[in-house]
Amino acid sequence: MDTQIAITGVAVGKEINNDNSKTDQKVSLPKADVPCIDKATQTIIEGCSKDDPRLSYPTKLETTEKGKTKRNSFACVCCHSLKQKCEPSDVNDIYRKPCRRCLKHKKLCKFDLSKRTRKRKPRSRSPTPFESPMVNVSTKSKGPTDSEESSLKDGTSYLASFPSDPNAKQFPNSRTVLPGLQQSLSDLWSTLSQPPSYGAREAETTSTGEITTNNHTKSNGSVPTNPAVLASNDEHTNISDAPVIYSTYNSPVPISSAPTSINSEALFKHRPKIVGDEETQNVKVKRQKKSYSRHMTRSFRKQLQSLIISQKGKIRDISMKLDTWSKQWNDLVEKSMFLPTIADPVSVGIISHEEATLRLHLYKTEISYLSKLPFIKVEENVSVDELRKKKPILFSVIMSCVSIVLTPKQTTRGTIMKLDSFVLNLITNQIFKANNKSIEIIESLSTLCLWYNFFEWSSKTRYHIFNYICCCLTRDLGPTYVNRSFGMFSDEDPKRFKSPLELYSNGASLTLLVYISALNISIFLRQSIQARWSHVTEKACEDLVKETKKSRHYDNDKLLLDSADDPILVQFAKMNHVLENIHTHLHERDLNDDEFDDPIFTKKYLNKLMEKYHKQLQEIFTKLDRNRPRVIAFYYSVEAYLYQYKLAVFIGEMSHTINEKVELPREIMDDFVKCYHCCKSALEEFSKLEPILITSLPLFHTSRIIYTVGMLLLKLRYSVVAIPSFHDLMPLTDDAIALVIGVNNLLEKTSELYPFNNSLYKFRYVIALFCQTYANKVIDVADRYNAEREKLKEKQVIDEVSNGHDGTKPINAYVTESQKMPTEEDPIIDNNTNQNITAVPDEMLPVYSRVRDDTAAMNLNINSTSYMNESPHEHRESMTGTTLLPPPFISNDVTNSADSTNIKPSPSSSVDNLNDYLTDINSLAWGVNSLNDEFWTDLFMNDI
């Protein structure tokens, strides 16, 4: 380590090593009696490189816009140890000239520029379009390796290694970034009503398997433009046995657009901890233990508890798994590259020939045959070698997609990640490099979109990009008007001119599959629909209906799926056509345009549309086979989506009277009942499926089922709980919680059997968010209504004291509301009060039961959301008439009601125990934002 002693007026600089060890950065001070150092004119500067300009040139003290001098960013070692302000003796040369304190006491002034004077919190601002917050990501967890995996042969002729750049600089982590978003969490929390559960903290080294961030700062370091910095520091990930090239060419040069440089999964350690873990944050959002929600009825609390018990810790556990796998996947993709000459995964040794044979067999049987829908057709007797030779791209995609039905005994996660990475590079090379426009590319992209299973977060998915390219290729190779116009130059009749997709034997089926997948993906991501119903899809349906086995010209080869399944595909496509119309003409309507229209005409027009779509769905339903539960479940989800629109419009119109009980129109009540029965039927049909049928479901199919779960829980069930006008429909939705728990348990069972289906984990994560959001919002409604009830009681007492008997005058204003409430004679409520948690008992509304005398009511704080504005005097009078059924732990007679005030809730249903299963608000906010604006967010009603 060299020590540089400069001439008079120049600081003595010390060069430190470029490693991260703090011990290497420390250098011994020169002795005070060294004759070459003048304490009055020279200083010692540590912690900067040899070519740092602060060593050679004077540094002026910064000034503000108003001309005032700023405080020095670095204090000298002496002032820093004394915690005193360091004032430079020369404001035009603050580092090379001693400070006033050292100059006064004739001490040697030394500056350590390798560390800051304090830990600064990052500024809460969003990055500009010209900059992007960068972080260096490293991990101690080993990559996906396994002794049983197929090792690749060394010395492959077309593979060469590209060493990483050793001069790649590092840069500090300046902010916490949401997964896949250029926005800091501090910016997000500022828009929420809850305070942030964590602030900007220095990153710390975590245990094995956790992700850490690099905090050391290089003085005068700038963000490097060399893309090798994105892949040069991870030396612990063991993926050397993959046939990949470690190259700097894989990372994009523009840092702001690097797909994985801002690795959202690497920042998972900054997420707020879930309730139940050790508290490590300075600020923690917790629900107050002294909450009005303890006065819910026992059955309501027990059923609510059964819901969130089933989801306890699921958000944390699933997100940790997704985070770990996504980190490994991104590392592998970021650092690997397969040359275009690579044809298939068998030739490079990612999977063996035996495993490829197994995967192809599973695709033919478990995915294609059992699906009862003619997806991408493969001949039954085609072998691995034949498919590799004829359609190597489709073969590679099939090998990747079949991972969803494999068990741990059949493959490993490391092999799957290598295979997915290979497919990603192969597809990219064929589309963007080789410019390959063929039917095989359409088949490959369509298959990939149907069973997309890459290990990545929702905010990092690429299937919508593949879907867009697939739609473009379908238009290019399909019967477009461009192809028709060029037909006039041929010898054939232009009307008989056929496009490549029309000439292909499975062209009609492929056209409908692209339409179905593209439509659902567009709705799923709330994007503009890429493939709409047109004359092309209409003609494809007609061709499939007329098609026979003989017209396919397969004399010796037998197709796995013959023409008998084509009518099912046609009906499924028409069902999606109705879904497209419902989404486009109803859910995506611009309500602002209605301001200029006649409301009566608009209402009639919408009613006619709904009647038309309902009639079309009924015609399709009569042609469906009742023994196909997956198709029937999809149908019910579409029909529920139809009725959901009218309910959403009605709730939006009554937002100003949302807390008042008004009589529901008959048509709204009927639509609510129909919507609930459709949701219930869809989930019941889905529950009939075996795990193998669930794991082989396409992405678009499962997404509609999960959306139906959220609609049932957060739209329908929450409406009868929170909106007084829907209270009378409470008995109808009593089995909603049991259905949600049943679907969740079925998905968990399927995930245990097929742990490599990453989409199942994502859907379980969404259901966990649904359940936790529902529980939090229900308790918030209970607290809010009871708090307002207490305020009204206090106001009533003050009015009675101040005005005497005049205080009872406004009471009669609420008599009408009390007469509209349900009575004790409701047989559905009376029959559901003695169920236990395991059987998922009926969940009472937060319509908290009333007792006969005022003392018991005041002690128990029991009230009703529908009686929120009711006075104690009216409360006593209304008990003589029709009244609401009391909760199970309060008797109907006065004596038992008074004695019940001393009964304590059981530990299994106490509100404190209930709060232990709730996830904090910040975690829910993070989870919702990580869904990348998917259509789940439409289900959260924040205005109720």
Swiss-Prot record:
Recorded consequence of changing A640T: Causes hyperactivity with constitutive induction of PDR12
GO BP: any one term: aromatic amino acid family catabolic process
Impact when changing S368L: Causes hyperactivity with constitutive induction of PDR12
Region of interest called Disordered, as start-end residue ranges on this chain: 114-171, 197-225
CDD domains on file: GAL4 (cd00067)
GO cellular component: mitochondrion; nucleus
Keywords: DNA-binding, Metal-binding, Nucleus, Phosphoprotein, Transcription, Transcription regulation, Zinc
Biased composition (Polar residues): 135-144, 205-225
InterPro entries associated with the record: AAA_Catabolism_Regulators (IPR052780), Zn2-C6_fun-type_DNA-bd_sf (IPR036864), Zn2Cys6_DnaBD (IPR001138)
One annotated GO molecular function: sequence-specific DNA binding
Signal peptide from the UniProt entry: none
Major subcellular site: nucleus
Impact noted for substituting S703P: Causes hyperactivitywith constitutive induction of PDR12
Modification sites for Phosphothreonine: T128
Compartments where found: Nucleus
PTM text: Phosphorylation is required for PDR12 induction.
Residues annotated to bind DNA: 76-109
Classification via PANTHER family: TRANSCRIPTIONAL ACTIVATOR ARO80-RELATED
Other facts noted in the record for this chain: Present with 907 molecules/cell in log phase SD medium.
Job of this protein: transcription factor which binds to a weak acid response element (WARE) to mediate stress induction of PDR12 and FUN34, encoding an acid transporter and a putative ammonia transporter, respectively.
Subunit note: Homodimer.
Protein name as catalogued: Weak acid resistance protein 1
Taxonomic lineage: Eukaryota, Fungi, Dikarya, Ascomycota, Saccharomycotina
